[in-house]
Curated annotation (Swiss-Prot):
Keywords: Host cytoplasm, Host Golgi apparatus, Host nucleus, Late protein, Virion. Pfam families: Herpes_UL24. This is Protein UL24 homolog. Induction: Expressed late in the infection cycle. It is found in: Virion; Host cytoplasm; Host nucleus, Host nucleolus; Host Golgi apparatus. The keyword Iron does not apply. It comes from the Viruses. One of its GO terms (cellular component) is virion component. Residues 215-252 are annotated as: Disordered. Its main location: virion. Residues 237-252 have a biased composition (Basic residues).
């Protein structure tokens, strides 16, 4: 099954939850333990003191990985000067596992699409290899989050690839290739305003606004019934109304 066959509303909801994941990562950027826990403890313990840079939706040729986490190692025993993690996030309504990736057609399509995204994104860096530069450890990771509560259900960390790259050049490449609209959204400090802006960005806000509130619908229905009653009374024959009035008077 291809993900292109999913309804547009499901894709928009997925985009909305991606933005929520990005916001959480930014909030944990200064806390290695919380960031590592949120992403499945994929970072080794020797990077606890590393400086962390985070980039979102970086365009690398035909591919746009969801998130790139760049860690500058300060461990003198580390064979790599830099560790670069490419993340692909998938969100699901229900729980996802390795078993569901094999048997659930949607989870399987998400997983395979994520693998292609990661593979091609990392391969894009090969054109910038420099023989006498420092060694990088480039690691692809795919994560499945449940939309309710942003719970990490399942992740897969793949073997890293060694590449020799210029830190200043690659860091600048990542920074300038980020999606500007996403950066603007993530800069909103207030969470309520951020949530509303994300809904508007993903077109969810306008879809919900098209539905009139229930109270408005009830009020409108009542008004219509009152108008209908008045119209019936207006159209009724006058002599019939008078006879009815006389009968009511006699009963009294």
């Amino acid at each position: 099954m291809s993900l292109t066959g999913l309804p547009d509303i499901r894709k928009k909801i997925g985009q909305f939850h991606h933005l929520r994941i990005y916001k959480q990562i930014l909030s944990f950027q200064g806390n290695f333990a919380r960031l590592n826990y949120f992403l499945g403890d994929v970072f080794p313990a020797n990077l606890r003191s590393a400086s962390v840079s985070v980039f979102f939706e970086v365009r690398l040729g035909p591919r746009i990985p969801d998130c790139i986490v760049l860690l500058k190692s300060v461990d003198v025993k580390d064979e790599f000067a830099f560790h670069c993690y490419f993340f692909e996030f998938k969100t699901t309504l229900g729980k996802s596992t390795m078993q569901s990736v094999h048997h659930n057609c949607i989870h399987q399509a998400q997983y395979l699409q994520g693998l292609r995204q990661l593979q091609q994104s990392i391969s894009f860096l090969d054109q910038y290899l420099i023989a006498d530069e420092v060694s990088w450890n480039v690691v692809p990771v795919i994560c499945f989050f449940r939309q309710w509560g942003l719970k990490l259900d399942f992740f897969k960390k793949f073997s890293g690839k060694t590449k020799r790259l210029s830190f200043s050049f690659i860091r600048d490449l990542f920074a300038r290739s980020q999606d500007g609209a996403v950066q603007s959204l993530l800069s909103i400090p207030n969470y309520t305003n951020f949530r509303r802006a994300c809904q508007k960005h993903t077109d969810l806000y306008r879809k919900r606004c098209r539905k009139a509130p229930k109270s408005v619908l009830t009020k409108t229905s009542g008004e219509n019934r009152s108008r209908a009653s008045r119209q019936v009374a207006k159209n009724a024959p006058k002599n019939r109304i008078r006879r009815t009035a006389k009968k009511d008077a006699k009963r009294q």
